[in-house]
């Protein structure tokens, strides 16, 4: 059981016999009336996101989730294959288990996979990863028609928007939660 003061992003709750992961939450204390917590919950099975409001101080059942450190091995065309770092056991996770962040997976990358009752719920990448730019067009000085950014293809095949000064071969730090460029990494 968890109190609403224990809420944090990533916490998995058991609501109506469904596992719901907190994606976003906000404590609200209105001028009149009791405080409450507004949340966005993602169903870990279907991926559906819903809004739910809890009164402050309410106890909510948490799911017993086991997070394991794993290494991403490869993509077999239908699944991401990961290996448990302790037991060397391999697991096949469907693409949707990593969500949009899956496009930033590189072989031998360290990831965390959450399990409940022996079943893999979802995988998480580090908050930021360093990836090399495979291709980008040269940026034209003074070109501000698209906000000072241009598309770049990364070594994983993902395409993101980067500043005009980025060149092919640069290594970039990417936020895996949003898919945004953070900085250029010195080689």
From Swiss-Prot:
Pathway: Protein biosynthesis; polypeptide chain elongation. GO terms for cellular component: cytoplasm. Gene3D superfamilies: 2.30.30.30, Nucleic acid-binding proteins. One of its GO terms (molecular function) is translation elongation factor activity. SMART domains: EFP, Elong-fact-P_C. Keywords: Cytoplasm, Elongation factor, Protein biosynthesis. It is found in: Cytoplasm. One of its GO terms (biological process) is peptide biosynthetic process. The keyword Cytoplasm applies. This is Elongation factor P. Involved in peptide bond synthesis. Stimulates efficient translation and peptide-bond synthesis on native or reconstituted 70S ribosomes in vitro. Probably functions indirectly by altering the affinity of the ribosome for aminoacyl-tRNA, thus increasing their reactivity as acceptors for peptidyl transferase. Its main location: cytoplasm.
């Amino acid at each position: 059981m968890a109190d609403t003061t224990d809420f944090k992003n990533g916490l998995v709750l058991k609501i109506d016999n469904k596992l719901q992961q907190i994606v976003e939450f906000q404590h609200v204390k209105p001028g009149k009336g009791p405080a409450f917590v507004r949340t966005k919950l993602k169903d870990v099975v279907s991926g559906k996101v819903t809004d739910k409001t809890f009164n402050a101080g309410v106890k909510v059942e948490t799911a017993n989730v086991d997070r394991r450190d794993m290494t991403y091995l490869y993509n077999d065309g239908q699944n991401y294959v990961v290996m448990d770092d302790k037991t060397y056991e391999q697991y096949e996770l469907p693409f949707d288990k990593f969500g949009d962040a899956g496009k930033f997976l590189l072989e031998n990358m360290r990831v965390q996979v959450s399990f409940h009752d022996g079943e893999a719920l979802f995988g998480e990448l580090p908050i930021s990863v360093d990836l090399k730019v495979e291709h980008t067009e040269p940026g034209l000085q003074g070109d501000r028609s698209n906000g000072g950014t241009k598309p770049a293809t990364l070594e994983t095949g993902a395409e993101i928007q980067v500043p005009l000064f980025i060149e092919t071969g640069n290594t970039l730090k990417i936020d895996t939660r949003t898919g945004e460029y953070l900085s250029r990494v010195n080689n």
